[in-house]
């Protein structure tokens, strides 16, 4: 994965092309990103006002000029737990236009966690402070898959799953100090979250 999306279009192409050349010589596939997602990732902070949807024509040109194997696009998702201030909305029209131009290129969505309400509530009920956290509804993510998205990143949901259970364990029994107890609960919640995504949202079971 190479993300040079915070650079201008030509610089993004230049950096990505170098990575693709290096990786392909060694039999490694490359995912790149075009368009800007709001939020913070790897210490790169993009304000909501600076976020930018992916242009379908640029997406086609980007893939042709870089030779990248898969492309992460921006259609309204964002990094972190606060993805929408109002109603959730994704630009499926942009996604469809990109897939029409790049039918054989796997499309990726970053920042697409559901920010599962039950896990947010568990965090907040046990000493957490993440009011107003909101993500992409599962129904939208399922629709994205139906429109041709091949990979959906949901790191925030896994962070929430782990944190929610650790907070619950400590709140219910402050004397706990054995990592196996709180990490075990966290692991099971992560497993349940992943299973739910695979079976009910991405519908990807048995397709690896």
What are these regions (language model features)?
Residues 2-106, 117-122, 126-134, 138, ...:
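Alpha/beta enzyme core
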Residues 110-114:
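Short catalytic/ligand-gating loop segments at beta-alpha or beta-beta junctions
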Residues 125, 136-208:
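C-terminal alpha-helical cap/extension of soluble enzyme domains
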